[in-house]
Amino acid sequence: MEWSKIKNIVLLILVCVNAFLLALVLLQQHKTARFQEEASAGAVSALANSGIAFHLERVPRDMELAGLNFTQDRSGEQAAAEALLGRVTEQAESTTMRTLYAGANGSAEFFMSGEFSVALDAGVYQADPDELERAGRDCLALLGMEAELVSRETREQESVWTYRQLWEDVPVFSCQVELTWRDGSLVLLRGRRLAGSALPADTGAPLTTATVLVRFLAGLNEGNYVCSSIDGMRAGYVVSGASRSGQLTPVWRVETDTGAYDVDGVTGALVPVA
C-alpha cells in the first residue's frame, strides 16, 4: 500500500478518535449540567416546602472563589492620609496598634486591623452635590480602594454614602466605608479597608450552590431564624481576624425579607449579618 494512502488512513483514524473523545466530553458536560439543574430544583423545592420563596430568576452558578491569606500593609497609611489632608505628621500618642496623624486640614487614625477614620475640615475636599457618588469613588481611589456604592442616607444637612471594597472585582462584605458630606464638603470617612497582599489558602473545595441553599435552610432551623423569601445571592469575601494577618473567607451573601445572612462557601456555616 502506498505511503500516502496509509497516511490518510491514520489521519482518518485520528479524526474519528478525536470526534469520539469530544462526544464523550460533551455528554459528560450535559450530564453534569443536568445534575446541577436537578440539584438546584430540589433545593428550591425544599425551600418552598419550608415556606421560603426563591425570588431569583435562577440559582446562581457554583462559586469559584478560593480562600486567601491576607497580610495588611501599613506602610502606605501616611501617604493615604496626605492624599486627602495634605501634609500630616505622626502624633506622639501613636502605638503599634493605632497610628494617629494630624495636619492643618484635619486628622486621621489607622488601626492594625484595617479600621480607619479621617476627619477633614470643611472645604478641604469639595464636590458638586450632583456628583457625590463619583466624588466618593475618586476619594476612595486616593486611599488605594476600589469600591462600589451600597447605600445613601440623608440626615438633615448631611448625606452619608456607604461603599463596599472590592478585591480584584469581588466584594468584601466586611469592608465598608462611610463618607459623610456636609454642604458639598467631605467631612468624615470611617470604616475598614484592606491594603496589602493576599496568597491562596488551603481551605478546601467550595460547596455547590444547591448545597449552600440546603445548608442555609438547615442553618435557619438550627438558629431559629425566620424568613419567607430569598431576594438575592452574591458570592464574595468576609475578613476573618482583627490583626495584621487574617483570611479572606469565601461566602454567599443571602438577602432575605428579614435580613441578610452569610453562608460559608466551604463549610456551609450560617451567620446572620448584623
Task: Please place each PLM-identified region on the residue numbering.
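Preferential activation on post-signal-peptide N-terminal prodomains/segments
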Residues: 1-147
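Residue-level detector of functional hotspots within protein domains
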Residues: 5, 54, 163-165, 172, ...
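Generic alpha-helical propensity signal that fires on short helical segments
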Residues: 37, 72, 83-88, 179-181, ...
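Acidic-enriched, low-complexity/disordered segments with a strong bias for Aspartate over Glutamate
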Residues: 62, 73, 121, 128-130, ...
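Exposed beta-strand-loop-beta-strand "reactive/processing" segments of non-cytosolic proteins
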Residues: 73-107, 112-113, 143-183, 234-263
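Extracytoplasmic/luminal low-complexity segments enriched in Pro/Gly and acidic/polar residues
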Residues: 186, 192-274
